[in-house]
């Protein structure tokens, strides 16, 4: 059995969880609930970065981060690969994943700054910069929504998990406004069983 260190609210964990479902590997993974913010956590022994997700293989190898874990899982099933082999399709999938993960990075940095720091230490300019990054990147996705029309890849999985996280943590900011194409795509994508089964919860 593989072991997955996870947090139920992490969008990066969700990406891995969706992959395990889509690849049919869920039964081969033992999930271990982990709070990376707990000062007593032993997560650092598995991932020296102290982050989830982290995967431990049956032979004891530690695999991180989510991108590497997903590619590792993709090599373990016999269906069509989620990391495409054809160069152009692969480039699109990897770019979509990079953009989705970058939006998440900005969203989480902003979340920590705005909601975790004491108000007197919050840096508004930093938060505005992250918000600009998020919105500019979402606009890029809207303008190139057709990139999501191909078969299921790591790119579409990453984008779907990212948009789900924005609904989860930024429900008061409507990312759908002015992005009808992206909103329509996500409305359908969110109905996949792998997405319904991995909705984040506190």
What is each PLM-predicted segment?
Residues 1-124:
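GST-like domain detector, emphasizing the conserved glutathione-binding G-site
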């Amino acid at each position: 059995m593989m072991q997955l260190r996870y947090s139920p609210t992490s969008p990066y964990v969700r990406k891995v969880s969706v992959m395990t479902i889509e690849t049919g590997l869920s039964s081969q993974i033992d999930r271990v609930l982990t709070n990376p913010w707990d000062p007593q956590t032993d997560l650092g022994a598995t991932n020296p970065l102290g982050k989830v997700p982290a995967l431990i293989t049956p032979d004891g190898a530690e695999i991180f981060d989510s991108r590497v874990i997903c590619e590792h899982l993709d090599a373990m099933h016999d269906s069509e690969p989620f990391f495409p082999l054809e160069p152009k399709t692969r480039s699109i999938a990897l770019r979509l994943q990079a953009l989705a993960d970058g939006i998440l990075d900005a969203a989480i940095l902003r979340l920590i700054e705005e909601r975790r720091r004491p108000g007197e230490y919050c840096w508004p300019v930093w938060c505005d910069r992250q918000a600009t990054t998020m919105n500019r990147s979402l606009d890029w996705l809207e303008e190139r929504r057709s990139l999501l029309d191909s078969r299921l890849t790591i790119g579409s999985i990453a984008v779907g998990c990212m948009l789900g996280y924005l609904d989860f943590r930024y429900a008061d900011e409507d990312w759908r406004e002015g992005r009808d194409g992206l909103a329509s795509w996500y409305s359908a994508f969110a109905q996949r069983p792998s997405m319904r089964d991995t909705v984040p919860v506190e």
